[in-house]
Amino acid sequence: MKEGLAKTTPPGVGGDRIEACSYPESESLFFKRTLGRDDLEPIHDDRAENYIVSYSLVSKRREVEQILDRIHHLKCENEPVKWPGRSAVVRTQIDEILSNMAKPDCRSFRWNQHYQSALAQLKAEMMQAHLKPLCLSAVAETETFRKNLKKNAGFMAFETGKRSKGENLDEALRLAEASESEDVMRRHFCKPLVVAIRTSNSGISDWQAGTWKERTRPILMVDLRQLLQSSRFGVPFNDWFQSHVSWGEGGMTHQQVEQWTWKARTRFRHWLSTDFSKYDSSQSSWLIEDAFSVVKAAFPGLNTHEEGLFETIVNSYIHKEIHSYNGIWRVNKGTTSGEIWTYTINTIIHRLIEVTIFSMMGIKRYESLLCGDDGLTYYDGELDLAKYGSLITRYFGIAVSMGKSTYGSAR
């Protein structure tokens, strides 16, 4: 905590919430390195449902207060932009995600030879891609980007009052290009994430039962300007990743998945589907950095500016300022939903964990199909499942529920 600010707990709020929203002096190196400044001061938001002390850059203070006023107005006027606060269940989910992201990293496991070998293996696989980043105008014309123009523009929607990406696209392109050199110099886009809620229907099991169950979950909306820059690398990489990586499920049809499963069952003796707990929000910064180093291996021959832009994308992905219903959180770990990298980084991290732990436990023959934290692995050999889960938790800081995981004999 900054000197002079008492660490008090708001009514009904856990003590770690305050630590999550404050930024200790000992950790201000990030701002000196990436933003070139360390002029932080507290902002008090008495409109939050739980009074909380939060921080923002002094230069951004007026802007933040204006945005909070607009968010408050949207809540009262029931505008199309969704803002959580009505449902205690959703608020609890948001608090759990942000509290987990605010926890310290688990100790780095980079020193381990099995992990180093797994990382080198994935990088070698990506080196076959030989990709090049897109320019901003080309990103806006891709099918991946065009099909999402009706979705929310993130923080920019509150700035302009226009909800969708399509309504903000021209202005976002202009602003992203104008600020690119400054963003790269700071190694950060300085665009906060906004918490929203998404309601969707469940799938096959509900269809069989004749009912459609709605599921509401929080998501973190990335600013459109940052998304445009991230997509310069993300769009070409995701397209290649989904069509060339054998262990990635993305892009496969149901028939292809069934065909893969049928073949794997005839070749291996056992199968395993691991259930991770709080997978996205538990990922340490060093693990995310290494996952992005795997991505970078697919882009050989980057010039100095492109190297800086990629580092800016990684830095902004890891070190996040999140505007929630109860204040501003600053976190330095975890993967966010609503990002172009969400599926890719989650899947690469899953693969890194799996290859490392299987190597440690002597499992040499296996095949996997992974999609983020979900996956199905067929393998030969004897695997101590309890030890398998405990090693993942110990070395990667991600909890595994073996009671919810499914496994069995393939024959």
Which positions does each model-derived feature cover?
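Viral RNA-dependent RNA polymerase
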Residues: 1-411
